[in-house]
Amino acid sequence: MDLHLEATGSEHSFAGKDGLNIAYKAWSAVGTPRGVLVIVPGFNSHSGYYGWVASNLAADGLAVYAVDLRGRGKSDGERFYIDSFGDYASDVDGLVKLAIAANPGLPLYLLGHSAGGVVACIYTLEHQTQLAGLICESFAYQVPAPDFAIAALKGLSHLAPHAHVLKLANKDFSRDPVVVAAMDADPLIANETQPTKTVAEMARADDRLKQSFGQFTLPVLILHGTEDKATRPSGSQFFYDHAGSTDKTLQLYDGHVHDLLNDIGKEQVLADITSWIDARLR
């Protein structure tokens, strides 16, 4: 599924950890490339949702890559299941290495959406020297679930790790009915429900990040919609407040919902991302 078929990008894959085939899309920079952006989608998403974003950034001189995490999009693996968010981070690592090899010497930025933001943060903690900056969009650090429910899921993940327990509503991702209709018709996310183990591992990754935000030193851009029902803007505020980076920016979008780059008003969000990257490429 690509909301903008004229900007689908070229499809590729590489052998990831455990031999799984990891799919990704790539968009070549228009003219001489100035930098690189690697995109990490979250739940109810995949690389196909970033065609319009990537084509615009490519026109601005960026080589853009978007990964399908294992078990998602067109990548191999049990659907939506993960043993550890470290496995997702290994998928990101594989794509980053490919992007660096194809664009030697260029600054590389990493953008993660929602759960993809958690993955991006986990990856960044171990690879800050390779990155020029981190962009976290609708960061899934705090979610609208009580602590006791999260604790129960962590326990259940040991007993029934493959049980599917969390289904996000597509209508909470965008106020644009065209986007929601496209999501509803997308076979790659049809009936997407997260297994107990996946949800528990995200909670464990968030626990780790809580102790590690002060270790971030690279430039960070944090974006969140005030009406996001899938993740809490307070989580992005917490990241901003505790990040060790001296170059950090928090942008809240009044009235926007979960998928900022596919929501009404997405043009302003992309303009802000583009301006932020441009300012650091000078």
Each language-model region and where it sits:
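N-terminal cap/lid segment of alpha/beta-hydrolase-fold proteins
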Residues: 1-31
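Alpha/beta-hydrolase-fold enzymes
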Residues: 113-194
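Alpha/beta-hydrolase fold nucleophile elbow
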Residues: 103-114
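Short beta-strand/loop motif that positions the catalytic acidic residue
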Residues: 216, 222-224, 228
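Conserved alpha/beta-hydrolase
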Residues: 54-77
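Conserved alpha/beta-hydrolase "acid-adjacent" motif
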Residues: 229-235
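Catalytic nucleophile-loop/oxyanion-hole region of alpha/beta-hydrolase
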Residues: 44-47, 73-103
